[in-house]
A protein has these predicted regions:
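Gly/Pro/Ser/Thr-rich low-complexity, intrinsically disordered segments predominantly at protein N-termini
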Residues: 1-208
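Phosphoinositide-driven peripheral membrane association surfaces
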Residues: 213
Length: 213
């Protein structure tokens, strides 16, 4: 990192320094207070599904949260719909570390406005920002280099060090209960409860086989 980059980081406020009161329906965009209206069913339902999916696909080293405020600049304090960030606190400040992944659901707001938020998050250092476009049933990733959204292959997966197992893109864009995708992720992570259930099932099958012999 160059000395100019270090100076720029030092001049930024901590990500946990608030411009707005937490747990209120407001964000700060370019120094102006912006009211964020409560979600309607399509947005709220997809956000709930997304939270379940992200929780299932992250490992113990990361946490996920909904509507988590992040101070991206001196004049911006904004909250992605879902954030994925390190579970360990920042060793320098003791506060939360910057998220590695951010997800924004596009329903009532425009993709252009979601792009403005993505640019602010990426400018602060968030590694990857995604958008779930409900109306067009597609997922996109923000390209800081191009300053635009890039559509993702619906048959593909999101692979990232913040994820314990790859996240299927189809599960993000289809309006369906995420149970199957969550179950597959937990099996891939060798969830202890599921592993115990599987072992007990195998033991019962072997016992039944011996009894029938």
């Amino acid at each position: 990192m160059s000395s100019s980059d270090s100076l720029a980081d030092a001049e930024l406020p901590d990500i946990n320094d608030r411009l707005v009161e937490p747990d209120t329906p407001y964000e700060i965009w370019d120094g102006e207070v912006v009211y964020v209206s409560p979600a309607h069913p399509p947005h709220g339902q997809r956000q709930r599904q997304l939270c379940a999916l992200i929780d299932a696909h992250t490992g113990p080293e990361f946490q996920s949260a909904a509507d988590l405020l992040t101070r991206t600049s001196r004049i911006d304090d904004i909250a992605p719909d879902v954030s994925v960030y390190p579970a360990a606190p920042n060793p320098a400040t003791g506060g939360r570390q910057l998220e590695h992944l951010a997800f924004e659901i596009v329903s009532k707001q425009s993709l252009r406005r979601a792009g403005r938020k993505a640019a602010k998050l990426a400018g602060r250092g968030v590694r990857r920002v995604f958008a779930i476009d409900i109306k067009r049933s597609r997922a996109l990733e923000w390209s800081a280099e191009a300053g635009a959204w890039r559509e993702l292959d619906p048959a593909g997966h999101i692979e990232d060090p913040a994820l314990a197992v790859p996240l299927p893109i189809a599960s993000l864009i289809h309006d369906a209960r995420p149970d199957d995708a969550v179950a597959r992720a937990l099996l891939a992570k060798r969830n202890p409860v599921l592993m115990q259930e599987r072992a007990e099932g195998h033991a019962e099958s072997r016992a039944e086989g011996r009894a029938e012999a």
